[in-house]
């Protein structure tokens, strides 16, 4: 029996942080075709499960709030990737998303004790806060210069640049990088002709 197709992992999600996956949930395939993964309940369930965001009833999905957060995260990524910084509006909106009641819980495991922040209520506001917090954590850990947006204008995938020199331009050199090189070569040939 063939294993079920996991649209979350095969599409390249789940590698860095939940905020990046949500920002990329509106996916351009590199040829100008758009897929809105937030509209797919299977993708959303895989996203929540992968990032250990408590499974919630799918009938209660706050689609509008998730789309607003996606727009905010993408705008933040584009500003930071262009060398700018977040404006007061973005910071205020992120802080608003982060404003959920939490409590500390002491947890013991084989390595000893640790304090854990847990929600007062496990609901969608907590999920939204955790997604927004993942961007805050990346910014606070001085990983700002690693946040990039694919240079392919038909893709615009948000990614974390893992290279030492932080010079990566494309989300995937084999796809978007090759397309860019082919376009440049064709444009050069056209100019010569």
What feature does the model see in each segment?
Residues 1-149, 156:
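Short helix-coil boundary/hinge micro-motifs
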Residues 126, 130-193:
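BZIP DNA-binding basic region
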């Amino acid at each position: 029996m063939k294993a079920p197709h996991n649209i979350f992992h095969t599409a390249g999600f789940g590698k860095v942080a939940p905020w990046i996956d949500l920002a990329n949930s509106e996916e351009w395939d590199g040829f100008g075709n758009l897929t809105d993964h937030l509209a797919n309940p299977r993708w959303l369930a895989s996203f929540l499960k992968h990032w250990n965001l408590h499974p919630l009833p799918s009938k209660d999905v706050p689609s509008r709030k998730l789309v607003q957060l996606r727009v905010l995260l993408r705008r933040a990524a584009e500003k930071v990737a262009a060398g700018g910084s977040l404006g007061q509006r973005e910071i205020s909106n992120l802080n608003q998303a982060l404003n959920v009641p939490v409590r500390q819980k002491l947890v013991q495991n084989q390595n000893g004790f640790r304090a854990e922040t847990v929600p007062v209520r496990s609901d969608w506001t907590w999920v939204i806060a955790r997604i927004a917090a993942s961007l805050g954590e990346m910014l606070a850990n001085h990983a700002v210069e690693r946040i990039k947006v694919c240079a392919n204008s038909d893709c615009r995938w948000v990614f974390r640049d893992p290279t030492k020199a932080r010079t990566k331009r494309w989300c995937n050199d084999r796809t978007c990088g090759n397309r860019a090189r082919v376009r440049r070569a064709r444009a050069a040939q056209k100019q010569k002709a």
